[in-house]
Amino acid sequence: MRSAKLLPFIVTVCAILVLGSGCSRAAEPASSTYTDLLALFADWRDFESPPLLDGAPDYTVAQFVARDDEFRALEKRLDAFEIDNWPIPEQVDWYLVRAEMNGYDFNQRILKPWARDPAFYKTVWTYRSDVPAHEGPTHHALVELWTYEFPLNAEAAERLTGELAIIPPLMTQARANLTGNARELWIAGIRDIRTQSADLAELKLAVGDSVSKSLLNAIDESIVATDELVVWLEGEAESRTGPSGIGKDNYTWYLQNVHMVPMTWEEEVT
C-alpha cells in the first residue's frame, strides 16, 4: 500500500484532530520551520520510493533491513518539530507526513503485501480506479494502460516499452519475496496475475504490427514472465494454509495511526 495514497483519506480527520487536541513534540529544534517540514517531506518521498533491483522496484527483505536506519532517522526528524504555534493548515501537513510514515512502518512490520499477497505484483492496469490511486496494496511501477491512446504514436510506444520492461524482473523477484502463508490472498492473487497475462495478450493484438519490434518483444517477454509466475503460484498454493487477516489490534492501530480515525475495530463494526 503505497503511503502516497493515504492523503485523500486523512486530510479531513487530521484537521479535526489538530483542532481538538494538542500537538506537542520534542522541543530540541524549536526553530524548525514549515520550510524545514517541506524539505523533510521531499526527503521522505525520495526514500519511500524503493531502489531498483535488476530494473524493478526492490521489495526484498535485504532492502528493507538495509534502509531501516534511514527510515528511523526520518521519523526522528519529524518528531523533533515543535508545531504548537503553527497555523492549523501547516499542523495538518505535519500530520499528513506522520500518517505516511506510519503507513510505511505498518506495511513493513505487519501487512507486508510483497511477501503475503501475489496481487501486489499486478503491474498492468486497464482501467482507472474510482479512488485517487488504486484500492489495495500496489507497487511503485504500475503500467496504467488506460492512460494511453491507441494507436500509439512513437513517443507513447517508447514510454510503454520502458514501463513494460520492469515486468520480467519483478515477476522473478516475486517468487523469492512471496514467503507468506495467507491462503485467501494467495488464491485471489493467482487470478489477478493470470488476468495480467490476458491483458498483455489483448495489448499485443491492439498494437498489431505497426509498432516497433522492441515494444512487441517487451510484451512477449512480459507475457512469458507473468505466465511463469502463475505456474509457480499455482504450484505453491496447496502449501499456503494460513489466515489472511491481520488481527483486530493491528487493524485498530492502522485505523488510528495511518487513517487518523479515532476509533477501534469494535467501534467500527458496531
Language-model features and meaning:
Residues M1-K5:
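N-terminal secretory signal peptides that target proteins for export/translocation
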